[in-house]
Amino acid sequence: MALMSKAAIVTGAAQGIGKAIAARLVKDGMRVAIVDINQEAAVAAAEELAGQYGADTMAVQCDVSQEEQVNTAVQKVLERFGTVD
C-alpha cells in the first residue's frame, strides 16, 4: 500500500525489463509514465498495462541520450501526474 497513487517514470518501458518493472509498479498501484524512444511501442505498453491492471499510465516518446527530450518528457509527466515519487 505504500506505493498506492505515487508516480514513477520508467525509461525503456515499452518492452523487456523496463516493461516488467512498469508492470510491477502499476500492479502495486502506482501511476506510471512509460518512456521509450519508440512512440508506438510506448503507447501499446501503456494501454496494455492500463487495461490489465486498471492503472493510470501515460506514454512519452523520448530519446534519453538527448537532454532536451528528457526535460520535455519530465515536464509532460509533471503536467499529468503533478509529481514524480
Describe the residue ranges of each PLM region.
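Conserved residues in the N-terminal Rossmann fold of short-chain dehydrogenase/reductase
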Residues: 34, 60-61
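Conserved glycine-rich Rossmann-like NAD(P)H-binding loop of the short-chain dehydrogenase/reductase
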Residues: 28-45
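Intrinsically disordered, low-complexity regions enriched in polar/acidic and amide residues
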Residues: 14, 51, 65-68
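The beta1-alpha1 cofactor-binding region of Rossmann-like NAD(H)/NADP(H)-dependent oxidoreductases
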Residues: 39-43, 61-75
